Amino acid sequence: MSDYVVIGKITKTHGLFGSVKVLPLTNALEVFQKLENVFIKNDAQSNTHRLQIEEIRKAGKGFLIKFSGIDDEERARKIVGLSLAVRVTDLPKPKSPNEYYYYELLNVEVLDQSGNFIGRVEDIIQTGSNEVAVVKNGSFEMLIPVIHDYIIKFEKRKRLVVKVPEWI
């Protein structure tokens, strides 16, 4: 699925006419507003299936989406738990060179300010205030806030240079 980026997760059905609630897995919410089609994917499998969006609207921290061909709660229930993805080429371009998508951080090597290898970004988790990179090196794990105070330099898909918090 390297040509695709997961942008959300279908969490539950909504109503009787096939709408579903989607939890965004990106902070670039404008991606959702421009969608006409998405690909659904079971995380355990590599195949994708394209769905056309009939209607999309913001609802709390997520979105309510109505797909063409999914017209009742029973059909909607079959896609609950699946991931929503878009083609990488369909993502809006970042507004500045200092902006990036979280998928671009995954698996990159992380170095401290002195050039010492810390580990690789295994995951990005969302907290209440900001996102945090989960950096692992064997059994060693470090959580680094993904904010300008800690990110010194990012070379897309290669390496991330970070300021290691003083308390570590």
Curated annotation (Swiss-Prot):
Residues 97-168 form the PRC barrel domain. An accessory protein needed during the final step in the assembly of 30S ribosomal subunit, possibly for assembly of the head region. Essential for efficient processing of 16S rRNA. May be needed both before and after RbfA during the maturation of 16S rRNA. It has affinity for free ribosomal 30S subunits but not for 70S ribosomes. Gene3D superfamilies: PRC-barrel domain (2.30.30.240), RimM (2.40.30.60). One of its GO terms (cellular component) is ribosome. This is Ribosome maturation factor RimM. GO terms for biological process: ribosomal small subunit biogenesis; rRNA processing. It comes from the Bacteria. PANTHER family: RIBOSOME MATURATION FACTOR RIMM. Pfam families: PRC_RimM, RimM. Binds ribosomal protein uS19. Belongs to the RimM family. SUPFAM superfamilies: PRC-barrel domain (SSF50346), Translation proteins (SSF50447). The lineage of its organism: Bacteria, Thermotogati, Thermotogota, Thermotogae, Thermotogales. InterPro entries: PRC_barrel-like_sf, PRC_RimM, RimM, RimM_N, RimM_N_sf, Transl_B-barrel_sf. NCBIfam families: 16S_RimM. It is found in: Cytoplasm. The keyword Amino-acid biosynthesis does not apply. GO terms for molecular function: ribosome binding. Keywords: Chaperone, Cytoplasm, Ribosome biogenesis, rRNA processing. The PRC barrel domain binds ribosomal protein uS19.
